[in-house]
Curated annotation (Swiss-Prot):
Function text: Involved in unsaturated fatty acids biosynthesis. Catalyzes the dehydration of short chain beta-hydroxyacyl-ACPs and long chain saturated and unsaturated beta-hydroxyacyl-ACPs.
Pfam family, any one: FabA
Gene3D superfamilies assigned to the protein according to its UniProt record, in alphabetical order: Hotdog Thioesterase
PANTHER family noted in UniProt: 3-HYDROXYACYL-[ACYL-CARRIER-PROTEIN] DEHYDRATASE
Catalytic activity line of the entry: a (3R)-hydroxyacyl-[ACP] = a (2E)-enoyl-[ACP] + H2O
Location in the cell: Cytoplasm
Active site: 54
Enzyme nomenclature, EC number: 4.2.1.59
Gene: fabZ
Keywords (A to Z) from UniProt: Cytoplasm, Lipid A biosynthesis, Lipid biosynthesis, Lipid metabolism, Lyase
Organism: Cronobacter sakazakii (strain ATCC BAA-894) (Enterobacter sakazakii)
Keyword Zinc-finger on entry: no
Name of protein: 3-hydroxyacyl-[acyl-carrier-protein] dehydratase FabZ
Length: 151
């Protein structure tokens, strides 16, 4: 029995997400199963623009951007699970619960985001996310997103 891996390269990610540099925080999808899970990677470079001020002499990847990277991974999973959006629709980051930061992420790290689908209720989908560096948890959170027409 073989296990099939589903990967997405940057060109496919750019077709799914509206984010662009410097706010695109997913470099590659390593594996996913529609409606279940997605594993993606962000290669953290010292050339990221926010490292100039966060923090001079001790660059640390901002925690809020770790959460955003996980949220972008949930967006890709949602798109691959339910299809592309109609014109005028967006997926909105609707909420976050139980966010915890365990250790810093620094230049040179390869951050792996693992997100799993939990449930959809009243148009809001809940995902569990974890970010890892070298197999160690750096952040975990429960995130919600909603599909909606632009205001």
């Amino acid at each position: 029995m073989t296990t099939e891996t589903h990967t997405l390269h940057i060109e496919e990610i750019l077709e799914l997400l509206p984010h662009r540099y410097p706010f695109l925080l997913v470099d590659r999808v390593l594996d996913f199963e529609e409606g279940r899970f997605l594993r993606a990677v962000k290669n953290v470079s010292v050339n990221e623009p926010f490292f100039q001020g966060h923090f001079p002499g001790k660059p640390i990847f901002p925690g809020v951007l770790i959460l955003e990277a996980m949220a972008q991974a949930t967006g890709i999973l949602a798109f691959k699970s339910v299809g592309k959006l109609e014109p005028g629709e967006l997926y909105y980051f609707a909420g976050i619960d139980e966010a915890r930061f365990k250790r810093p992420v620094v230049p040179g790290d390869q951050m792996v985001m693992e997100v799993t689908f939990e449930k959809t209720r009243r148009g809001v989908t809940r995902f569990k996310g974890v970010a890892l560096v070298d197999g160690k948890v750096v952040c975990e959170a429960t995130m919600m997103c909603a599909r909606s027409r632009e205001a």
